[in-house]
């Protein structure tokens, strides 16, 4: 008998329990059967709903020993702790860039390596890989420069260009 006999027909991922496969399938279907009674937000998994409830109660029992910042669950504290250690355990197999959070790696792969640009500027028709990049691009049309150098007062449309500029001081 195979160790993981339950196989997702969508992606081929294997599971040892049928219920785990059933939960996994929600990542493909988008099914979100768990609903927050406070705000109506929906979740695919009960554990995510329970974690979300803490945002309403403001309960943050997990405290960083380095800086005192508090978190609603242990996993968020663990991710935060990497900001102190510099640990980046998630590596992009396409370019080797490392990330401290898996979801940021996934976003990177989608935005940089997929070639897809589904976010289209209504002003000029240019496509972008993420909503974030489109939002930044829109500033080229509006002239908005919300990122300001504290040394000289010069404004920039993106945080990236502000950091590039700061190296000149």
UniProtKB/Swiss-Prot annotation:
May be involved in transcriptional regulation. Belongs to the krueppel C2H2-type zinc-finger protein family. The keyword Nucleus applies. The keyword DNA-binding applies. It holds the Pfam family zf-C2H2. A zinc finger (C2H2-type) spans 6-28, 34-56, 62-84, 90-113, 119-141, 147-169. InterPro entries: Znf-C2H2_11 (IPR041697), Znf_C2H2_sf (IPR036236), Znf_C2H2_type (IPR013087). PROSITE patterns: ZINC_FINGER_C2H2_1, ZINC_FINGER_C2H2_2. This is Gastrula zinc finger protein XlCGF62.1. GO terms for biological process: regulation of gene expression. GO terms for cellular component: nucleus. It is found in: Nucleus. Signal peptide: none annotated. Keywords: DNA-binding, Metal-binding, Nucleus, Repeat, Transcription, Transcription regulation, Zinc, Zinc-finger.
